């Protein structure tokens, strides 16, 4: 595209052991799951508070 600068080639970082990648992936998935769980609990609480009559 005109006006865009060419992207510099990224230099590869140091290779990491597969175990490190698995641990990092597991941590990220856990954080993501915790956020979703918190949101669901919050929505359930709000729906109980604002539900009319029951």
UniProtKB/Swiss-Prot annotation:
The keyword Mitochondrion applies. Residues 41-50 are annotated as: Required for mitochondrial location. Coiled coil: none annotated. One of its GO terms (cellular component) is cytosol. Residues 1-20 are annotated as: Disordered. It holds the Pfam family PMAIP1. A motif (BH3) lies at residues 29-37. Belongs to the PMAIP1 family. This is Phorbol-12-myristate-13-acetate-induced protein 1. The BH3 motif is essential for pro-apoptotic activity. Signal peptide: none annotated. It is found in: Mitochondrion. Promotes activation of caspases and apoptosis. Promotes mitochondrial membrane changes and efflux of apoptogenic proteins from the mitochondria. Contributes to p53/TP53-dependent apoptosis after radiation exposure. Promotes proteasomal degradation of MCL1. Competes with BAK1 and with BIM/BCL2L11 for binding to MCL1; can displace BAK1 and BIM/BCL2L11 from their binding sites. Interacts with MCL1. Interacts with BCL2A1. Interacts with BAX. Interacts with BCL2L10.
């Amino acid at each position: 595209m005109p006006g865009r600068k060419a992207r510099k080639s990224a230099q590869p970082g140091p290779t990491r052991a597969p175990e490190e990648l698995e641990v990092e992936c597991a941590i990220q998935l856990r954080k993501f799951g915790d956020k979703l769980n918190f949101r669901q609990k919050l929505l359930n609480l709000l729906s109980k508070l604002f539900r009319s009559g029951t």
